[in-house]
Amino acid sequence: MADYYETLGVERGASDDEIKKAYRKLSRKYHPDIAGPEFEDKFKEVNNAYDVLSNPDKRRMYDSGVDPNNPNAGAGGFSGAGFGDMSDVFSTFFGSAFGGGSQGPVPRTQPGRDALASASIDLKTAVFGGTAHVKINTFSLCQECGGSGAQGGAQPVTCPDCHGQGFMQKVVRTMLGQMMTSAPCERCEGHGTIIQNPCPSCMGHGRVRTTRTVGVTVPAGINDNARLRLANQGEVGEGGGAAGDLYIDIRIKADKQFTRDGDDLHCWIQVPMSWAVLGHDLSIDTFDGEKTVSIPAGCQTEDTVTLKGLGVTNIRNKDERGNLIAHVNVLIPTKLNETERGLIEQFAASHDSGATHVSQASRPQAGQKKGFFSKLKDALS
């Protein structure tokens, strides 16, 4: 007999809340839509365990040594006498009387499955947090019947054929003589109850498939591909059962101006040659509004200027933020009039002293960036 307590990872004396909490955790962990199709059997085991332990009557039966989902798998019957394999053979021919089927009514109310969706946000929302809206298509509670499945909200009535047992017994003639077999009640489909007037909206299922928009609170500092959980926002179960959870995978869209590296943001600014030589204060747009960047005199291409505290919010400490790092690109003029060229040549002559030879030691090494004046000479030569 399967150990349902071990399957859910709880003690035999676990409370209903502990069992439900364990089930929620494991159903999310092994849900085929999340963990992958290879976990489908494990997911079914978890559901079977919860089906028994969440039902007081079934749990009492199980604790007494009889599995409600397989009554003949306990100490009695053929398996108790060492004929487990024969039990399977008999069940093939004669039904659940020989250890094959599940006896007892099947609950109409079943827990809902978890759902998975994705949301795209811009980089600014990732920096400061915000709200994303996701459109999902899932089973929702039928508003017409409130989940009962019956028209007008009426409750199901006891099946007159099986008298609420969910299965029917009959005597059949076999090579071994007359045998008693049992099978799910055809009239109530094993539920033990029938819905006399099914709800026209959900056709007696207590739920309908709908498309709805869900608001998702995005925490500041969230990373790309992070997954958020919204409890009880997944699919409503059969018979209006409790909804599963909704998982949202976050995708951060590329930004035209900034890139992200951990908690730091990076941007690129182009400055005229004169600003790089003399230094200059300029304004740039940031996620915090317009800010001033001070370009130091003698600034080179690929130099950086750091604006502290203007980066991404730290997801673990909302009072901390990374930095905004501005990368400088000095614009070298490619077209000069005679006056401008003359001034540049005078400037170059005063610094280069007419030198035409560069010693080997002063050449840039591999991976070393050229200085501003070297680039200027390259542009004018």
Curated annotation (Swiss-Prot):
SUPFAM superfamilies: Chaperone J-domain (SSF46565), DnaJ/Hsp40 cysteine-rich domain (SSF57938), HSP40/DnaJ peptide-binding domain (SSF49493)
CXXCXGXG motif repeat residue numbers: 142-149, 159-166, 185-192, 199-206
Alphabetized InterPro entries for the sequence: DnaJ (IPR012724), DnaJ_C (IPR002939), DnaJ_domain (IPR001623), DnaJ_domain_CS (IPR018253), HSP40/DnaJ_pept-bd (IPR008971), HSP_DnaJ_Cys-rich_dom (IPR001305), HSP_DnaJ_Cys-rich_dom_sf (IPR036410), J_dom_sf (IPR036869)
ZnF start-end (CR-type): 129-211
Binding site for Zn(2+) 2: C159, C162, C185, C188
UniProt record, GO biological process: chaperone cofactor-dependent protein refolding; DNA replication; protein refolding; response to heat
Alphabetical list of Pfam families matching this protein: DnaJ, DnaJ_C, DnaJ_CXXCXGXG
UniProt KW keywords: Chaperone, Cytoplasm, DNA replication, Metal-binding, Repeat, Stress response, Zinc, Zinc-finger
GO cellular component terms given for this protein: cytoplasm
Subcellular location: Cytoplasm
Residue spans of biased composition, Polar residues class: 356-365
Location of the region described as Disordered in the Swiss-Prot/TrEMBL record: 355-381
Residues binding Zn(2+) 1: C142, C145, C199, C202
GO molecular function, a single term: ATP binding
SMART domains: DnaJ
UniProt keyword Zinc-finger present: yes
Annotated ranges, domain J: 3-66
Cofactor: Zn(2+)
Free-text remark on how the cofactor is bound: Binds 2 Zn(2+) ions per monomer.
Comment text on domains: The J domain is necessary and sufficient to stimulate DnaK ATPase activity. Zinc center 1 plays an important role in the autonomous, DnaK-independent chaperone activity of DnaJ. Zinc center 2 is essential for interaction with DnaK and for DnaJ activity.
Function: Participates actively in the response to hyperosmotic and heat shock by preventing the aggregation of stress-denatured proteins and by disaggregating proteins, also in an autonomous, DnaK-independent fashion. Unfolded proteins bind initially to DnaJ; upon interaction with the DnaJ-bound protein, DnaK hydrolyzes its bound ATP, resulting in the formation of a stable complex. GrpE releases ADP from DnaK; ATP binding to DnaK triggers the release of the substrate protein, thus completing the reaction cycle.
Subunit structure, as described in the record: Homodimer.
Family under the similarity heading: Belongs to the DnaJ family.
Record's protein name: Chaperone protein DnaJ
Organism field: Bifidobacterium longum (strain NCC 2705)
Gene this chain is encoded by: dnaJ
